[in-house]
Amino acid sequence: MSEARLHSPDPRTPRPMAGWAASLRDSGLLALAVPRVFAGMERDWGEIFAGVRHLAEQELELARRLALHHLQIASILLLGSPEQQRRLLPASVERRWLWSEAVDLRRAQPEAQEHWRGGFLVGGRGSDCFAVEDVDRLLISAWHAPSRAHLIAVAETGRAGIDISGLADGSGLFLPAGQRLHYQRLRLHPEDILVPPGLPPPPCGQLREGLTRLAQANLDLGQAARVPGDVAGQGEAPRLLALALRLVELAAESFQAAFARGGALTFRESAAASLLASEAEAVARAGLLACLRRQALEARLLGAAL
């Protein structure tokens, strides 16, 4: 990743997020997680997340976008059929698609109704998303009431039935600020569906959430590295950050091994990798908060001395 060049957009431009997207498309980083058989670069997860971490030291919003993109590529590898992978991944590399997501498996909205020939119609308020107006493809979720389960699907952002409007307040992973999606009779074709509703989740499904937590841990470590060294090197922060760095490295190795297992992956192996990612996220967040508290204390002391 050190060979790539990323240039921050001018914050005075009317659409700075468009500048972020253009920077990523020009960087050569979008194909890192795509296997070589699909014309990608096939880097391991340790290298990918190290790049996200270092990028977060410079431009946190850009790092968030890059992490989200790679998580969607991973989702296609984990959840998609061989035909879906052959259709989506080479096109993503060739056309430099930027991916994001509107997946929320905790809410029973939006709603999906079965449509003809195995498709679905989706309507209602979707998830709050991070800067989706300049991405090319989305992973979305919808609630299917008859099966009392969610589906996960792929859709292009310009598809009829997707309305991107307003600013979301931002909460949870990757949502410092974003857009709110609404769906109006959004048609999903059978080939769009990565996870049909009502089927038991496979072991690889756990890895998706674990990867999200591992990405957040690396973003937190990158943000902590932006705190001046004389501040971050005091108190409990150094111990926490060193432990978090080791945990994210171990978790990345665990996920790499899990991906290599393919269809032979067990629930036990998937759960172990995801648990390690959760521990890394918790320690990284604690280290970041320790840095920020120390920085705030130093600022107050400096202000009192002036």
Q: What are these regions, as identified by a protein language model?
A:
Residues 2, 7-15:
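Long, charge-rich alpha-helical interaction segments
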Residues 17-130:
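Glycine-rich flavin
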Residues 59, 218, 225-228, 244, ...:
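A structural signal for well-ordered alpha-helices, especially hydrophobic packing surfaces
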Residues 125-126, 165-170:
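Glycine-rich, charged/polar anion/phosphate-binding loops
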Residues 128-164:
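A short core secondary-structure module
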Residues 168-234:
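Glycine-rich beta->alpha junctions and the first turn(s) of the following alpha-helix
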Residues 235-272:
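C-terminal hydrophobic structural anchor segments
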Residues 265-306:
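Glycine-rich phosphate/cofactor-binding loops in nucleotide/flavin-utilizing enzymes
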